[in-house]
Amino acid sequence: MLFSFRTLLFITSLFVSAGTWSSCIKVIDKSALSDAAIKAGYTAQNWIGALDTNTGNIGLPTVISISNSETFQPSGTLLASGIGNFLTAATGTPYSSKQVLYRCDTADAGKLYEMYSTNGDSAFAGAFFTPEVEGAYYDVERNVAVRMTNLSTGEYYSRFWKERQLTADSWFQDDKYIYIPASAFSNVLYEMFKIDSRKYFAYQNPMDRDTWTQPRGYIAFKGPGLITERIKAGLDHASDYYGWPSYWPGAWSTYNSVTYVRGALCKITDYPAIVKIPPVAVGILAAGGNSQAPFHVSLECESGAVSSALPSTSAANVAMGFVVNQPTAVAAARR
């Protein structure tokens, strides 16, 4: 009788546990959304995750110039930077801000995390830290290091996973579920630095198009019931990449978006940010008059620098221009 009572108690506890079990799912269509979520403007569609080439444009310059001189362009020089918006730059197909990527039970609140790391298993995309720039890792181009900053936490990406707990202000919730939209995930500050070390690299030609498919950083979502729940803060991405790629919603990459040009360069060391030219009547200009304002620019060039705006695979051509941001003046000049 005692045995039967304990058995019954055990079976009852199983039912209680099953009834309170919570879990998250990846949302790929509207069938996972409640009427309340749909009425609130939330949507859903299939998404493929952080595949190597499924990345967007971070907003970096299309051409990044690298000097072969360690004195003209010393270690730590910022070569380029951009802010990657998760909605538009983390995947090849942009997300809408209200596109739901995951659905969790309301009991999961407090257990939901954004996880982020560098590509810790790729030698040229986030595996090896360089001591020359804090938080930066060797990149595919020789003498270049990349540093990524999570703009929600202010922390640098690392090959060792970091986490950010999601809170109710970043999701939609009804009486049964929590819906995690794309807007819940963080943007990134992406920086590229010149370094002296040549320890890890794949490219070193006078001109290299970045065709390295490996992303430099990843964002994953961790919640109960998902395989990504096994990712813990502090684990090494080199061996712990549970749920990649289909359960990771985004990645940061420069694949097919930048070209590295190496050679003798020039740099501007002194210049005014804005030059204001006094207004002048159209009639005066038509009669041959003009309006002037003096300004000074200091330009320093390396030996061998080539002055040209033409593309080249044999030299890092340099050119300087001036931007006129007054639309009327620009239109008149083009007539």
Which residues are covered by each model-predicted region?
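Bacterial N-terminal signal peptides that target proteins for export
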Residues: 1-8
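Hydrophobic helical h-region of N-terminal Sec-dependent signal peptides
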Residues: 9-16
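N-terminal signal peptide c-region/cleavage motif recognized by signal peptidases
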Residues: 17-22
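N-terminal export/ancillary region detector
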Residues: 23-267
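Surface-exposed beta-loop interaction hotspot
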Residues: 260-284
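Short, solvent-exposed loop/turn segments enriched in Ser/Thr/Gly
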Residues: 289-295
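Outer-membrane beta-barrel proteins
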Residues: 301-307
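Short acidic, flexible loop segments centered on an aromatic residue
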Residues: 310-329
